[in-house]
Amino acid sequence: MIKQRTIKKEVKARGVGIHSGSVVNMTLIPAKEDHGVVFRRMDVGGKLVRAHSAFVNEVVLSTGLENQGVKVSTVEHLMSTFSALGIDNVLVELDSFEVPIMDGSSAPFIFLVQSAGIKEQDAYKKFFVIKDTIRVENGDSWAQVSKYEGFKVSLEIDFDHKKVKESGQKLSINFSKQCYLKEISRARTFGYMKDVEMMQRQNLALGASMDNAIALSDDDVLNEDGMRYQNEFVKHKILDIVGDLYLLGSNLIGHYEGYKTGHLLNNQLLSVILAKPDTWSIETFEEEGSPIQFYSEDWKNSL
């Protein structure tokens, strides 16, 4: 049977918080079976916030969690990493209210987990298996999940910007066949420089810079190093989706499809899914019959 996973040893990282602009210290700590992903805010007495849809309180520009007044913001890139590497159980210590943004992708977090090492545990890994189609809509935007033997994300974005249009706004990734590490993990968040400058005048997005995002002028990419992928914009949105879906508490087996989606619509979809327990099941799988192949340390995989 496929087993649950944690990390082999404690590992630390430091980075800037995109909201505060302050340095954030983060420590990943191995956790016991069935612990799940849990955040611990060391700056407020070690209070805990579980990484689950039930605790989502923020869906504007990023995904944030809250438990009894204690918040953890911008969790989606780290959650995307845990999903891709099959990490079920880990304690994430922070000395601030937000996960550090690093370079705006999940690649630094992938490296961090790989540096810690991945440990299989004794308990069987639980998968969230979609059995029926569930759909949510908001204006002309929509998102749905349906039954599928594996994990697949199909997305179309619609940004009225020359470079985004040129890069391709539609993509489907079958994670049973295509590698998250090579195809998705290095895709960075993006936004208009004029919007960032406006927010910073209001003391918002103080940590945002070209070191952690693709900065757009009205018609071009401002970063000197250009793009990491030809279609980096839509790939980053898929990275976000993988992270948001992991707030179900287990790796999803199903096909996510969306048009002009974001954190709000993703969270609405999770809420509807969880409210309809007859449309999904929690299952375990034999290694040979697994619909998902997770990263293994003996893979010849590099970023």
UniProtKB/Swiss-Prot annotation:
Its cofactor is Zn(2+). It is an enzyme of class 3 (hydrolase). SUPFAM superfamilies: Ribosomal protein S5 domain 2-like. Pathway: Glycolipid biosynthesis; lipid IV(A) biosynthesis; lipid IV(A) from (3R)-3-hydroxytetradecanoyl-[acyl-carrier-protein] and UDP-N-acetyl-alpha-D-glucosamine: step 2/6. It comes from the Bacteria. Keywords: Hydrolase, Lipid A biosynthesis, Lipid biosynthesis, Lipid metabolism, Metal-binding, Zinc. GO terms for biological process: lipid A biosynthetic process. One of its GO terms (molecular function) is UDP-3-O-acyl-N-acetylglucosamine deacetylase activity. Pfam families: LpxC (PF03331). Its EC number is 3.5.1.108. The active site is at 263 (proton donor). Zn(2+) binds at residues 77, 236, 240. Gene3D superfamilies: lpxc deacetylase, domain 1, lpxc deacetylase, domain 2. It catalyses: a UDP-3-O-[(3R)-3-hydroxyacyl]-N-acetyl-alpha-D-glucosamine + H2O = a UDP-3-O-[(3R)-3-hydroxyacyl]-alpha-D-glucosamine + acetate. GO terms for cellular component: membrane. Disulfide bonds: none annotated. InterPro entries: Ribosomal_Su5_D2-typ_SF, UDP-acyl_GlcNac_deAcase, UDP-acyl_GlcNac_deAcase_C, UDP-acyl_N-AcGlcN_deAcase_N. Belongs to the LpxC family. Catalyzes the hydrolysis of UDP-3-O-myristoyl-N-acetylglucosamine to form UDP-3-O-myristoylglucosamine and acetate, the committed step in lipid A biosynthesis. This is UDP-3-O-acyl-N-acetylglucosamine deacetylase. It comes from Ruthia magnifica subsp. Calyptogena magnifica.
